[in-house]
């Protein structure tokens, strides 16, 4: 009887314990313990620690610093500790925690280490995405076949002939190696072997699931990888049987959990109090007039800072919406061969959109200058890589490279000014291209090119529904975001997570083009959206490193020139103030904010060009008025939502099943990268080595690093800038409506029941009382903002306090 189905099922089961890892050029922040989310958080981190070796809670030093800085409310901490059965002073308990977590390093298995060394060498060669000049032979046949072909020439394999003589089928190899092991051991064996190199196996898992161009051309699977690994282990005589040792409970875990809950409750309490108070004020206020402009930003925490400063400069209204602007598309820029997903990883692209030239003269200028630059780059690359010319080229050009290196190191700002000046001679794509959004009745791969009119109307209506829009200003700007860094392998981690680690400008341009379509506007008016004739939609992109907002104004008529001029001036002022705030957060002088952020963007020796989403801890779903007068310190995701325009709860359902899941991914990536950077992060950028355009090593080889670098999280050694807290979501809506959504989506309720994030609802229909989710769709009353109405607040199910 064939065991092939059992092997496949066992591998699929084991693979859930390894998080997917996206290539570094399109880095996606995701929960490294996503496969454990069906378990309570406390149990998940314990099992992950046993399998992967990572810590699940912040260190004693981190808790102590938070307590000293006032980030943990002493009364809340006392209550949490008492409930957990701890009666001693927090400082004494922290000392006890420190003693309990001191443990000896685990022993290393020499045979397994040797197998890891061999495999990582060939994995890096096989999975290379364009950086190697000489490719691994026979990659088209798949990893297992290619590995068999090169193994006999690898002197690091003790008996290479054994590998070369393996069966052609990877399943047969696995069957042979596991023949002496009962089937009930297969899943644990696969789990241990996948967890041995979680970076590489996470990349294989993601690549196989994605089925992109590289995977189609050079296929690899976990089956082929495990066949090669098991064969190597068998060849070196390594033991395969899983350990029977039971998991020793971490004696400090329960105590650390109490400290973590108190820290989270301290932050959440302040956030909920703010939202509840503003909810009361919002109910008592009259609607204002038509704003001078409306700007829609990504829900990204970095947007909170620039939005706050824009609103302070004039009569502007800002909104938060997922940064892909609701368009699940694959995007191909002008004159590029590669398409990228421009939507969250939890969605599959539904359309192919490309840039098409509309201005022949500007296109000609772009092509001419780009051609000169590309030709020069190609000549230099050829001279460097050719064995016959490399030495002479280095001898001739070395002094010039040395001067350039010194200039970029000592005066990066001036060098960047020169690059910018040269770059201005080459028009940007958006200056002569428009996104091809009209349906073309053709396909690129499996995706239709463009969008039908009905699809355009649906995407625009969905955006306005989710944000609760009822009025439109003369200018409406959809503003994507991107970062600007130099010599940074992790640059995509600073771009838009909702666009799968790519810039959000293209999505903003697509939605603006859709909304300017007269046929679309007519259909929107039929659906109740009163769009004035003088409303113009446009796109822009927020540079999160420098806080510059670039406006793409090709769609703006002369009648709106004064509006646009005023907006540009106010955006410049907002940039100065936001850049000052960011510079100060990085320990620099706030008075030189713009120049300092520009330097960080240009300096190739700068390991911290910006903080990214460090500090993220909250997600507020509700009208902007709830937070517009509050400094949230760039720590909260903000999604616009108006419960009064969403009677059936469909908009709320879309937000909870989409953006809330993505923000939880981001939050857990930052959490685990902070609490154990060696296992779940990627260590220091200073010692990173990029490999294959897919990831980085720490040092000169080994496993791919899976998370965020230290410089994105830590102000200094053992001093986190990011406060490692699980996400606190606050929703402004009737609590019964939220309960209905959770009841319809068990996966959301599971995340909450298992404490991967928290949820609080401020109910405007119940005198703005706040309700905190407990479990099993039950709620407890948190606070009472108004004493005017003595009626007891109610929810579908309210747990006893």
UniProtKB/Swiss-Prot annotation:
Q: Does the keyword Transport apply?
A: yes
Q: Which residues bind Zn(2+)?
A: 298, 300, 481, 496
Q: Which InterPro entries match?
A: DabA
Name the Gene Ontology molecular function terms of this record: zinc ion binding
Keywords assigned = Cell membrane, Membrane, Metal-binding, Plasmid, Transport, Zinc
* Pfam family membership, one: DabA
Main localization of the protein? Answer: membrane
* Descriptive protein name: Probable inorganic carbon transporter subunit DabA
Location(s) in or outside the cell? Cell membrane
